[in-house]
Every structure is written in C-alpha cells, then in structure tokens.
C-alpha cells in the first residue's frame, strides 16, 4: 500500500513504525494503520478474509470485520480516550451476529479484557445483557475461576501498558514492574 501511494506521488512518513504510516500529497493525507498502538491487534489476512462489503462515497469497499474492530478497540483505555462506549454500542448492535468463537480466539491470553467489556455491557444495558450469549460469559468466567485456583506468579508484571501508553509508566519506571 505504501509503495503504491509513493508511486502515486505521496510522501510517506512513519511516525509510529510499529503500527502507523502517513501518506501526504497536497493538502490531503491518508493514515495507513497496520497494527494497534500496543502491537497486539496486528492487521493480518483474517481482517481481509472476514471483511464486510460496504459502500463509502458511492464506492464499493471492504470494511473492517466487527470482531476485529471490537478486538482492536477493546485495548484503548487512555486517560484522554477510552473506547468502552464504542465497544458497548457495537455489542448492542451486533452481538447476535458476531463470530464469538473467533472473537475469543482473537483475544487469546488477553481474554480478561474481553470479559471486562462483557461485564460492563451488562452494567450499561442490564435489560439487554443476554445479547451476549450465555456460553460466552460461562467460558470467560470459567477461565477466571480456573485462574483464581492457580497460584499467582512471583514475577512482577504490569500489563497496564497494553491498555494505556502513559498511565502505567510509573509502574514500569518507578515501581519495579
């Protein structure tokens, strides 16, 4: 993509090489996003395999699959930007059509983040919490129950920097995590 944009006369900048490039020409720019800022939700072939057909400005396009949108937005918990409301709205609108097995698989070892959003969804929309299938909640809560039966590691780990690039820096820089 960047090569094609460069060949079309765009200048390319990579302000965050691990996830974002920008292409500029005249007064216009295009963000080329190929991962999440934390490096977890990398754009891979599955984004394209499951893309949703749509139309933008009367042009046919392939849109990000809802599962990948949920996955990538779920980790955005900055002081100045929290995508939790977006997650709740996406779940309210699309929970019945989601490929929940694929979504759970996408979260992998970060399943607690998905569980936290599912729990918050039940708080935000208590009368609609059954939009999230019971087996999904049972699976995630089952993982939590199993985790609680496993002794904690002695290793000092702070995964907060996966959720916020700034808010957990004291943990890493000052408190020994």
Segments predicted by a language model, with ranges:
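Compositionally biased terminal segments of proteins
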Residues: 1-177
